Amino acid sequence: MVANFDDRDGYIWFNGKYVDWSDAKLHVLSHALHYGSSVFEGERVYNKKIFKLEEHTERLLYSASRMDMVIPYSKNEINDACNSIIHKNSIVDGYVRPIAWRGAEMMGVSAQSTKINFAIAIWEWPSYFDPEERLKGIRLEISRWKRPSPETIPCDTKAAGLYMICTLSKHEAERKGYADSLMLDYQGNVSEATGANIFFIKDNEIHTPTPDC
């Protein structure tokens, strides 16, 4: 049985220092829990190295800026922390999750005085899809929920609030026997899966949807 994510061994980088996994907690009245005010990244680790770490950190800082948040650490500090947590937890192949969120200093839509917290966790996480399903080909349902227009929210960010439609779509697809759901954008164009990018190769070139779809 897989251990719950709140009950594991290891360390989490939490606001500038390492804490035991079980001690990395936040208050129930944190703004992020009520209003979705958090941004994050998902970074794969192969043989103790993070794939495209620079690009991930740049996108994280961009997402935070677009969501009116200032992460209190520099790009280099974040990169160093992401690299160090691999060795701190003795992970060879895994997944790194940096996340920034608004704290509990204010409750309400306005949150300009909230503290921006920052944490980095790492764990061993195999392929997003079952290996047998990958060999057969992933079965996707077309979701009835669409990615929002860029005029409604900064949808070129990796913001937590944007993932609610992905959760709804994934649940619905799984209940129908599909592995995942294909998300379309507000114009009906192919966007992504619920938690994975979609691309195809044509004439030796990689084609993938634009970030604002």
What are these regions (language model features)?
Residues 1-73, 77-84, 109-213:
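Helix-start/capping segments and mature chain N-termini
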Residues 79-93, 97-106, 123:
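Short, acidic/charged, Gly/Pro-enriched secondary-structure junctions
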